[in-house]
Amino acid sequence: MSLLREHLVAVSQSKTKLPGKPSESTVRRWAKRGVRGKKSGDVHKLEIRYIGSTMYTSIEAFERWSERLTEEFL
């Protein structure tokens, strides 16, 4: 699925647009370093795209990422 066809959110606006109101630095960390899953040990990174110098994710990408993490920690 192409991130560009989804509801884009500038990472700088994540506090007002994403569930849980994560800070910009937290979203950047999730995108760059990811979160290691408890069951598999895999690192799950939040999908991002740069448009110019602005980093974007999407509501749908956040949902997919959080679903993967939920499975890892249940």
Residue ranges and their predicted role:
Residues 53-74:
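A short, Lys/Arg-enriched interface patch at domain edges and termini
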Residues 12-16:
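The alpha-helix within a helix-turn-helix
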Residues 1-7:
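A detector for short, charged/polar N-terminal pre-domain segments
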Residues 17-56:
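Major-groove DNA-recognition helix of helix-turn-helix-type DNA-binding domains
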Residues 8-10, 55-56:
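Ordered hydrophobic segments in well-structured contexts
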